[in-house]
């Protein structure tokens, strides 16, 4: 599923667009970076995974990983459903809760309702989640994970397993370190040590082929989503 081979339209380049779609003739004529759009062959199955463990609540009440993640998931669900994709949702904290893939406005309502009720609690590892859902996901489906990437030693194994099965993995990671530092709950030395550890983890995940966006608090949602394009 995805784009077909029939040319549909030209549009201006957006950061994150594949250079393979660049229309160099249009660029030569106009001086503007333009990309080719193609007709879509069929809908894709999109899986949104939200980390709602206790750690996702780190930071101020209105500015923490869970708040940012649910907001991003709501925007992504609306976007994908508007283009006729099928969207499913998984949240994991003290338990694993899933919404089966479906399309349309009714599905958007179901997803938004589930996201609005997400609570931060528990500590279910990501690997337990991926082991549970893998048998029920079509191979190659885009998987978008929203997580602070903290306090979970199974993250690398989970992503390695997904990539080994050719899943297209995107990770939007609101940084709890930034929330804590901004709220003056973390001193500079502690921040620098933990930031280095986080940078190493993100580098490893990218090395596995995952598209990872390190989402800092001041970064607008649209910027974070553009930075994580490719799904």
Task: Describe the residue ranges of each PLM region.
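Conserved phosphate-coordination/catalytic loops
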Residues: 67, 120-127, 192-196
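An amphipathic, basic-hydrophobic helix/alpha-beta surface used to engage anionic
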Residues: 1-102, 142-146, 152-153, 158-161
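Short, flexible loop segments at the rims of nucleotide/cofactor-binding pockets, characterized by
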Residues: 25, 119-123, 147
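Short, solvent-exposed coil/turn elements at secondary-structure transition points
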Residues: 16, 93-95, 121, 175-177, ...
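Von Willebrand factor
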Residues: 103-141
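Von Willebrand factor type A / integrin I
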Residues: 133-143, 149-231
């Amino acid at each position: 599923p995805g784009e077909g081979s029939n040319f549909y339209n030209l549009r201006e380049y957006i950061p994150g667009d594949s250079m393979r779609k660049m229309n160099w003739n249009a660029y030569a004529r106009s001086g503007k970076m333009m990309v080719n759009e193609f007709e879509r062959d069929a809908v894709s199955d999109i899986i949104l995974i939200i980390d709602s463990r206790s750690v996702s609540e780190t930071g101020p009440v209105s500015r923490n990983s869970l708040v940012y993640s649910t907001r991003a998931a709501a925007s992504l669900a609306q976007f994908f459903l508007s283009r006729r994709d099928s969207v499913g949702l998984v949240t994991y904290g003290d338990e694993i809760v899933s919404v089966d893939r479906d399309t349309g406005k009714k599905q958007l309502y179901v997803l938004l309702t589930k996201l609005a009720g997400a609570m931060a609690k528990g500590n279910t590892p990501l690997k337990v989640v991926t082991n549970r859902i893998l048998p029920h996901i079509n191979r190659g489906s885009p998987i978008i994970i929203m997580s602070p990437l903290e306090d979970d030693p199974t993250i690398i194994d989970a992503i390695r397993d997904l990539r080994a099965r050719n899943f297209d993995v995107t990770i939007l990671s609101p940084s709890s370190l930034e929330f804590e530092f901004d709220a003056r709950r973390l001193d500079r030395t502690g921040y620098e040590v933990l930031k280095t550890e986080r940078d190493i983890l993100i580098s490893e995940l990218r090395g596995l082929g995952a598209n990872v966006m390190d989402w800092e608090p001041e970064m607008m949602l649209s910027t974070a989503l553009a930075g994580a394009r490719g799904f």
